[in-house]
Design a protein with these regions (language model features):
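N-terminal nicking endonuclease/strand-transfer module with a His-rich metal-binding environment
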Residues: 1-151
Length: 151
C-alpha cells in the first residue's frame, strides 16, 4: 500500500513534486491537506525552511504514495482520515502536504514531506527505526477502516 518514489535533489524538486501532487485534474474534489504549511504556498515554504538552515543539498523531500486496492472499499472521508493521521505522525518536526488523487480506478494519496525539520533543521534520515515506526502507525490506522497493509 505504500510506495517510495524518486530522488529529489535539484532546486526545483519542491515545486515540481507539489505541482504534480496538487494538479486539479488529479484532485477534482480538492482533497489536499498539510501540516506546518499553507497548502497554497507549500513549495515556497518548504524551500524557505531548507534555505534558513542552509540544507539545500542532498535529497530535499520524501514523496510517498499510499495506494488502495480497487478491491478495498473506503469512502473519501476514510481516505482523508488516514492521510491526516499520517501527516500528524510527521508533523512534530516536519512540513507535510498530502493530496488525494482520484484520476485512476483506485484512489491514492500522495504525501510530500520536507526532509528538513522546521524546528531545528535536522534532516530526516529514513532509518529502519523510522520506517518501522510509521509502518506500525499506518497499520493501526488502516485497521480502524477495515484495511490491511500489503507490504
Amino acid at each position: 500500500m505504500i510506495n517510495q518514489a524518486g530522488k529529489f535533489q535539484d532546486s526545483s524538486a519542491y515545486d515540481d513534486v507539489i505541482r504534480y501532487c496538487t494538479n486539479p485534474d488529479k484532485t477534482p474534489s480538492g482533497l489536499i491537506g498539510g501540516r506546518n504549511l499553507d497548502t497554497d504556498y507549500a513549495a515556497e515554504q518548504m524551500e524557505t525552511v531548507a534555505d534558513v538552515f542552509d540544507k539545500n543539498s542532498k535529497t530535499r523531500l520524501e514523496h510517498t504514495v499510499l495506494s488502495f486496492s480497487p478491491k478495498e472499499e473506503i469512502a473519501q472521508a476514510g481516505i482523508v482520515e488516514i492521510a491526516d493521521s499520517l501527516a500528524d505522525y510527521y508533523a512534530k518536526d516536519y512540513q507535510v502536504l498530502y493530496a488525494v488523487h482520484e484520476n485512476t480506478d483506485h484512489p491514492h494519496v500522495h504525501m510530500v514531506m520536507n526532509r528538513i525539520s522546521y524546528r531545528d533543521g535536522h534532516r530526516y534520515r529514513g532509518s529502519k527505526r523510522e520506517y518501522y515506526g510509521v509502518r506500525a502507525h499506518l497499520k493501526k490506522e488502516l485497521r480502524k477502516h477495515g484495511l490491511h497493509l500489503d507490504y
